[in-house]
Amino acid sequence: MYAKGGKGSAVPSDSQAREKLALYVYEYLLHIGAQKSAQTFLSEIRWEKNITLGEPPGFLHSWWCVFWDLYCAAPDRREACEHSGEAKAFQDYSAAAAPSPVMGSMAPGDTMAAGSMAAGFFQGPPGSQPSPHNPNAPMMGPHGQPFMSPRFPGGPRPTLRMPSQPPAGLPGSQPLLPGAMEPSPRAQGHPSMGGPMQRVTPPRGMASVGPQSYGGGMRPPPNSLAGPGLPAMNMGPGVRGPWASPSGNSIPYSSSSPGSYTGPPGGGGPPGTPIMPSPGDSTNSSENMYTIMNPIGQGAGRANFPLGPGPEGPMAAMSAMEPHHVNGSLGSGDMDGLPKSSPGAVAGLSNAPGTPRDDGEMAAAGTFLHPFPSESYSPGMTMSV
């Protein structure tokens, strides 16, 4: 019962326990009338200390009666043995308070709420999350916010983000990929930019679509998240979103927070609808694709691309975009003036308007996440925001 140390050593309480037991046995023998047996017992164990007897029936007898009552009240023995109601209630309470065998066998990491995302899916900067090996650590989201399951009401909407990716738009967040947002030393910028343009190399996935994905200086408009009441991705030509301004002609872009660029922030359709072009729309995997494009409107020349939100709000830029095919073709927009020197960048968009996507070239554009299996786009499907 007690752990033993080396040979001959014992727990200090063992000697006291033996003395107490011998005293209670002697006391029990005296209380039941076995005086000769009690004296013989003391002489055989060589008891030399003074003995103080307790009140009858003695501790040993009282302890045994309580133990036996509880023993008989156990669920598997209560039908065959007599027991008191107190013992039965004690056994029932102990059984109800005992941990479930199923829950007791689960690891600490397996007790997450149903529907919750993995911890790496909301990974913040290093040091902002507890270690996954600490079973006593509370379930916290990025930057110390309490984690809530997206399945329950009031919980945050799960943003569309790559695993192990920091939340975009937050101070201290790491870039999407090493060197993904660094300025290209060979990029000389668009003629209308007035300065060098930063290279945006999308990773193997799509940027997040959520309230945290807007960089500093940009504010998402009301109802900008994908959800009920917003226009779908496959709106017909001429249909524009409720926030579009009739005179804006720029695509908002913010470089103040690494990893905060989300493409044209005109999110529509149900959650999970991709905004970025499909991966199979490229014919040359060695060309660079710069996400700041030049849309051509009716009679419009080369558009201006300010580096911040325009005077008409960040969403005013979407009104100048003419319907583009969802498969990635840019209409009559040109991509001249952009260097094509980085072989590791994303393939350029060079298909003509309405060109069917060649599924055989899916492997060439490996820098985009493949579209969801349940979605299939045809060249006739257009998007206008």
UniProtKB/Swiss-Prot annotation:
Cellular component terms, GO, for this chain's entry?
Answer: nucleus
Q: Which residues carry this modification: Phosphoserine?
A: 341
Modified-residue entries (N-acetylmethionine), positions: 1
Q: List all Low complexity biased stretches.
A: 245-263
Q: Which residues form the LisH domain?
A: 17-49
Pro residues: bias regions: 267-277
**Does the record's keyword annotation contain Acetylation?**
yes
Q: What is this protein called?
A: Single-stranded DNA-binding protein 4
What is the native source organism of this protein?
Homo sapiens (Human)
Task: Recite the lineage of the species.
Answer: Eukaryota, Metazoa, Chordata, Craniata, Vertebrata
Q: Which gene encodes it?
A: SSBP4
